[in-house]
A protein has these predicted regions:
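A short, small-residue-rich loop immediately preceding and capping a beta-strand
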Residues: 15-16, 23-25, 96-118, 130-134
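Aromatic/hydrophobic pocket-lining residues that form π-stacking "cages" and hydrophobic walls in ligand
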Residues: 48, 92, 118, 265
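Glycine-rich anion/phosphate-binding loops
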Residues: 33-44, 467
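N-terminal small/polar loop signature for handling phosphorylated ligands or for N-terminal nucleophile
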Residues: 62-99
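Catalytic or ion-coupling anion/metal-binding cores of large enzyme and transporter domains
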Residues: 1-21, 26-33, 63, 70, ...
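Short, hydrophobic/amphipathic alpha-helical packing segments
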Residues: 42-46, 89, 223
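Low-complexity, highly charged intrinsically disordered N-terminal segments
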Residues: 39-61
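Well-ordered alpha-helical segments embedded in enzymatic catalytic cores
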Residues: 87-94, 117, 247, 430-434
Length: 598
């Protein structure tokens, strides 16, 4: 391997990544990757390794690639999506422990499950100097559709809105660069924001354009940071404090981040040995922190993520939150400096001025229209990010990205109120078939149950939300499910309903014809989802709870017949460790205690 005896005494550093595909030196594919997010990051890993060597270290590299949720949505491949995260985190930790001489770790990752897995892995090895290198974003196309819109081509093709040739052409043009995560603030982009916000990544590293010099520079700066951490006796556990996680949750709210981070942030906290945030913690932060970023898919203007980077990214948003006293700026990042110190430098930096000017000159966009002041955000109609409705259907709670509800179905006081008959399905496939067969009508409440961790590995039901989005009356149909959603999903979609149907939750007892009432106040962030009637009867929520308690779980819901044993095991283990609201983690102490008591 080219080892030099003279270098073996150097400090050993490990560069982990989610690299996928086989890329020739000229950039041409030898073998395709699953997605753009892992296609180019070997270049970042190489840049980091070269820097580590230049700084006197001896770099090692190891890989564990990651899947693409966009590729598996609507298929049984989605049953492995969330479980993969836990598996990959374990693999990364095993790889790190397999290099017992390691002095520090760099984790290069980009996308929906690979990046949270990497963050969990590094957090679980907090005694080491470590840093995340975000894999950046792809550039939006000059012609055609962005990566968010193009994910709806399946629904549009099935409704005769596109030919197969048109769909194929749009899909191949969706990304204007070969690498990077999707151009919208889905789970991948939100995870990058969160990594930087909690101090795991160097400042202004989230959402950088993949393949560009500034993107490679992030890898170099990250290597500098880890070596400096080693020299100064700083470890990742010194960065990942309870306040750091609160900062991450505040940035999630300010950006309008993906609801999947409600699964990932608690999991990272668990791995770091920090108390996991509760629904009440999330709710309190979203009530206090305004959304001030105008980005896909939330709008209203729908800027791609690279514009958010050019407008200043995480540091620029932090400047606004510091003014509002909504973040703890005494916290440190992997640079060893406090957020206060970094923001003071950022505010006057040439880097900030240069990138904001690039956005003005090249795109003709005012940076202050991408990352807005709280006052301008209110004027533009930006609303808080998520809320957590509860009720007799969701006694343990549920979640909705309330800022993504179509404004035309929200009244002047900011309230979405919907009451309608339930159409109940036990799989996403059956629900989509009903839409294709025109069995869903305006005013319906679409219920998809049996799709939580036990049923399907808690699949994403994006194909369903995208199908509704392109129905003329789709905004007048609500969705309630114990599954989860893609970070690009929009609409009146209530997910993560708990307890899940297969765990005896009320959502698994609903019947077609039941009357469901949904009320969501986007100003107070208070919401409810209740059974309030049967076919020819109406009653209040309290009576609805009594009736649901008397019902048996539907006899037609069961774990999907194609659910892999790997995922069945994951579902059982995460259920012992706190389930969905606990981040779907493997709490080993609880699992062992459960086994020993049985």
């Amino acid at each position: 391997m080219g080892w030099k005896a003279s270098e073996l005494g150097r400090d050993h550093y490990l560069v982990l990544s989610t690299q996928g595909g086989l890329r020739a030196p000229d950039g041409q594919p030898v073998a395709l990757g699953f997605h753009t997010g892992h296609w180019e990051i070997a270049l970042q890993a190489e840049a980091a390794a070269e820097r580590l060597h230049k700084l006197g270290g001896l770099p090692f590299a190891a890989f564990c690639s990651d899947p693409c949720d966009g590729r598996t949505q609507g298929t049984v491949g989605m049953f492995d999506s969330l479980p993969y995260r836990n598996d990959a985190a374990q693999v990364f930790r095993r790889l790190a422990r397999s290099l017992p001489t390691r002095k520090g770790i760099l984790g290069v990752a980009t996308c929906d499950k690979g990046l949270p897995a990497m963050m969990m892995a590094l957090a679980g090895m907090g005694d080491l100097p470590s840093a995340i290198v975000p894999g950046g974003v792809s550039l939006p196309p000059e012609q055609g559709e962005d990566a968010g819109a193009v994910q709806t081509i399946g629904a549009r093709f099935s409704h005769g809105m596109l030919s197969l040739d048109e769909a194929t052409e749009l899909g191949c043009k969706a990304c204007a660069s070969p690498g990077g995560g999707c151009q919208f603030l889905g789970t991948a982009a939100t995870s990058q924001v969160v990594a930087e916000a909690m101090g795991m990544a160097v400042p202004h590293s989230a959402l950088a354009p993949s393949g560009q010099p500034v993107w490679l520079d992030i890898a170099t700066r990250s290597a500098d940071a880890v070596v400096a951490m080693k020299q100064n006796g700083l470890a990742l556990k010194d960065i990942l404090t309870p306040a750091a996680f609160k900062n991450a949750m505040a940035l999630h709210a300010a950006f309008g981040g993906s609801t999947n981070l409600l699964l990932h942030i608690p999991a990272i906290a668990y791995c770091a040995g920090i108390e996991r945030p509760t629904v009440n913690d999330w709710s309190a932060i979203n009530k206090a922190v305004p959304r001030i970023v105008d980005v896909l898919p939330n709008g209203p203007t729908h800027h791609p993520t690279v514009r958010v980077f050019l407008a200043g990214g995480v540091p620029e948003v932090m400047l606004h939150l510091r003014e509002l006293n909504l973040i703890d700026t005494s916290q440190r990042s992997v640079t060893g400096r406090t957020i206060d110190q970094e923001l003071n430098d950022w505010e006057e930096s040439e880097r900030r001025h240069r990138f904001r000017e690039i956005l003005k000159e090249q795109d003709g966009v005012d940076p202050d229209d991408v990352i807005l002041s709280p006052e301008r955000a209110r004027e533009r109609g930006l609303t808080s990010t998520v809320m957590f409705p509860s009720g007799n259907i969701a006694p343990d709670g549920a979640v909705i990205k309330s800022t993504a509800i179509d404004p035309s179905v929200v009244d002047e006081s900011g309230v979405y109120a919907h009451e309608g008959p339930a159409k109940v399905f036990t799989s996403e496939h059956d629900a989509i078939a009903a839409i294709k067969q025109n069995e869903i009508e305006a005013g319906d409440v679409l219920v998809v149950t049996g799709c939580g961790p036990i049923g399907t590995g808690m699949e994403e039901t994006y194909q369903l939300t995208s199908a509704l989005k392109f129905l003329p009356f789709g905004k007048h149909v609500a969705l309630v499910t114990d599954a989860r959603f893609s970070g690009v999903s929009t609409g009146a979609c209530i997910g993560h309903v708990g307890p899940e149907g297969l765990a005896g939750g009320p959502v698994g007892k609903l019947k077609t014809g039941d009357v469901i009432s949904i009320r969501l106040d986007r100003n107070t962030l208070e919401g409810s989802v209740n059974l309030v009637g049967e076919v020819d009867d109406r009653f209040d929520a309290e009576e609805g709870a009594k009736r649901l308690a008397k019902r048996e779980t539907r006899d037609d819901i069961a774990p999907h017949s194609a659910l892999p044993d790997d995922t069945r095991l994951w579902a059982a283990l995460q259920g012992v460790g706190g389930g969905t609201w606990g981040g779907c983690v493997f709490d080993v102490d609880q699992i062992v205690a459960k086994l020993q008591s049985s």
